[in-house]
């Protein structure tokens, strides 16, 4: 197991290097001149040229890339073109709000999604199954921005129960986490149902019932462990989606997180921040997949990595 983990960690290096090259080329192909955006609409050509020189954008592309990659390998992601603050500080100040929002969304999405999926599988083709899958399809189909605006209209504007924007108290997390986790809960419900339906028809489940074990214990002890293996894979992918895909929700609720920072950086063509955020999101997905693979062995001891 240890050798497997070490090999996967070493495999991070070429993957992140490829991502670094691709994101560098991507941001430099974006239309628009960051020097012109920073200098302002009233700036003349001389001022824009001076700003471009200060930002290092007047150098050839290969020189810019060499400067970028050598600094990244040293852990230096540069300075934001807009705020003139180190990129690491910009990301650090926005990381925790996004992380806590992701964790909050993931907790309720997994609990409710798995509960609905298990109930739908146990009472398959009956009203709990139909109701649960109807809710799941609705949650997947409903756009996140529309759901967020609907929740804000009802609970913030009409009823006045919850705040609309900000991240100062636990109440600020309710509406964004519900909006962000709705699609994940729906996916988890459908995936859990599919996995449980397959497990419930296995021989060891029938054997446990024949021995007189209660249905609840059969489902929780014998069914849950075996059904969780594919569900854990989806759980890891969805966690990565939440952590890196909260851009729309953060924009709707004016959430001070990484998603909103990325949108603002793309608008201003803030190359260093865009590059650092994409690298961070890539690293998160790779590490989450590694954790999921390791959890396989914990859930099912029959699985071993060599």
UniProtKB/Swiss-Prot annotation:
**Entry keywords, A to Z:** Cell inner membrane, Cell membrane, Membrane, Transmembrane, Transmembrane helix, Transport
Would I find Hydrolase among this entry's keywords?
A: no
Query: From its record, what is one biological process in GO terms?
Result: transmembrane transport
Q: What is this protein called?
A: Glutathione transport system permease protein GsiC
The record ties this protein, via InterPro entries, to:
BPD_transp_1_N, MetI-like, MetI-like_sf
Q: Where in the cell is it found?
A: Cell inner membrane
**Native source organism of the sequence:** Salmonella typhimurium (strain LT2 / SGSC1412 / ATCC 700720)
**How does this protein sit in the membrane?**
Multi-pass membrane protein
Report the function annotation for this chain.
Answer: Part of the ABC transporter complex GsiABCD involved in glutathione import. Probably responsible for the translocation of the substrate across the membrane.
User: In the UniProt record, does the keyword Transferase occur?
Assistant: no
């Amino acid at each position: 197991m240890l050798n497997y983990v070490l090999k996967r960690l070493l495999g991070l290096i070429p993957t992140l290097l490829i991502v670094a090259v691709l994101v560098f080329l991507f941001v430099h192909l974006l239309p628009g001149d960051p020097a012109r955006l920073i200098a302002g609409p009233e700036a003349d050509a001389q001022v824009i040229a001076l700003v471009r020189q200060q930002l290092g954008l007047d150098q050839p592309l290969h020189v810019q890339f060499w400067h970028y990659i050598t600094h990244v390998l040293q852990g230096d992601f540069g300075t934001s073109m807009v705020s003139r603050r180190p990129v690491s500080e910009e990301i650090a100040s926005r990381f925790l709000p996004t992380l806590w929002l992701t964790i909050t969304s993931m907790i309720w999405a997994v609990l409710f999604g798995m509960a609905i999926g298990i109930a739908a599988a146990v009472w398959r083709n009956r009203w709990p199954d139909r109701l649960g899958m109807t809710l799941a399809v609705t949650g997947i189909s409903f756009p996140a921005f529309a759901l967020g605006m609907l929740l804000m209209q009802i609970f913030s504007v009409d009823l006045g129960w919850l705040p609309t924007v900000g991240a100062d108290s636990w109440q600020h997390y309710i509406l964004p986490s519900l909006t962000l986790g709705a699609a994940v809960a729906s996916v988890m419900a459908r995936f859990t149902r599919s996995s449980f339906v397959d497990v419930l028809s296995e021989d060891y489940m029938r054997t446990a019932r024949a021995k007189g074990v209660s249905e609840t214990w059969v489902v929780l002890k014998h069914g849950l462990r075996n059904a969780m293996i594919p569900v854990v894979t989806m759980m890891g992918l969805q966690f990565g989606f939440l952590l890196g895909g909260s851009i729309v929700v953060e924009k709707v609720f004016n959430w001070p997180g990484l998603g909103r920072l990325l949108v603002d950086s793309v608008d201003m063509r803030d190359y260093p921040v865009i590059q650092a955020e994409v690298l961070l999101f890539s690293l998160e997905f790779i590490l989450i997949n590694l954790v999921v693979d390791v959890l396989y062995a914990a859930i099912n001891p029959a699985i071993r990595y060599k």
